[in-house]
Amino acid sequence: MNILIIGNGGREHALAWKVAQSPMAEKVFVAPGNAGTALEEKVENVAISATDVEKLVAFAQANHIGLTIVGPEAPLVIGVVDAFRAAGLKIFGPTKAAAQLEGSKAFTKDFLARHHIPTAEYQNFTEVEPALAYLREKGAPIVVKADGLAAGKGVIVAMTLDEAEAAVKEMLSGNAFGEAGSRVVIEEFLDGEEASFIVMVDGKNVEPMATSQDHKRVGENDTGLNTGGMGAYSPAPVVTPEIHERIMQQVIYPTVNGMAAEGNIYTGFLYAGLMIMPNGQPKVIEFNCRFGDPETQPIMLRLESDLVELCLAACDGKLDQKKSQWCEQASLGIVLAAEGYPGDYRKGDEITGIESAVENQKVFLAGVENKDGKLVTNGGRVVCVTALGDTVYDAQQQALALAEQVKWTGRFYRRDIGYRAVAREKNNA
């Protein structure tokens, strides 16, 4: 069958690469795709924006698309799934109503509270003065979040009260994130270890994907500004089998059942960004209604099952009949970013060494365009170099060796991706 993937990032390159390996996939279209998806066998880019829902539906109808997988959040939040379903097309992702779990942080926090799902203490504000009063009452460190979609950058972890007050003023009166920041969520700072817990949902049944851990801060040792993610590895040893079970029982099932009970049946990838507290209690930091980027890249490297089969089963409400198989090895992905990211960054630099990957390694392209036959930088996060290894340390060393070979002017990356897992491995050795 023909398959359509919506999006243009490193995540979509990884999804297209994995989907193309399925014997069921005749042709894989990516809208709009990037220079990386264009290089894959069986894969073709389509010049349609990820949010041009009408054109996407028309394309799917004209090209006999048997399955569509949505990569990014923006098309989900505007109802791409509703439109495809109305046209009788199979699409894997949540409806517009269900996608509020990512589209509105205030909706999510209120939902978690209603269903007694563990999360940080919080309050929502639309006015500056009450928000500032709450900050002064609670003190720092404290977290300030823009309510709407802000490309992963609308979260300020304020270590001082001054920083928190500045963030509130900037979002509510300074209009830093436009409509997305017209309401803010202020919540307690959770001090634990983060994990990305991604599952597939068919409305009621849940199939967990491999666990992972993302690194949001731009600098080594988790310093500097928040980004969309500078690297990730899988599995995340912080999620022990016992904690895995707690997450399923205390977070995932209550979320899926709670959404269904409120009339928002959830199908699609559900990503719970969790803080695992020192006592092993998982708390929800955020939900995303799609696969994470860069977590998708190392996770797809470990997935041995047919992703198309899993998605089709989920679309048909038969996910309980499938079991995902995973490679025993660890995988790790390092994002190579353009100079200046996450602020204003350089563009248009020629990239070399993309073809350096050997077996058990893969370079996934994100902010890259093909200009007159040359690959040049065209985004903040440019590529994600990923590798498998017997341990997280091995995978890290393989990925670092690959990162050395992919070059352009001003590229930078974190050399410590996976450091928590590596420290655990050393302690357990």
Swiss-Prot record:
Uppermost EC category: ligase
Record domain ATP-grasp: where: 109-316
Any GO BP annotation: 'de novo' IMP biosynthetic process
Catalytic activity: 5-phospho-beta-D-ribosylamine + glycine + ATP = N(1)-(5-phospho-beta-D-ribosyl)glycinamide + ADP + phosphate + H(+)
Keyword terms, alphabetized: ATP-binding, Ligase, Magnesium, Manganese, Metal-binding, Nucleotide-binding, Purine biosynthesis
Residue positions binding ATP: 135-196
Protein name stated in the entry: Phosphoribosylamine--glycine ligase
Organism this protein belongs to: Pasteurella multocida (strain Pm70)
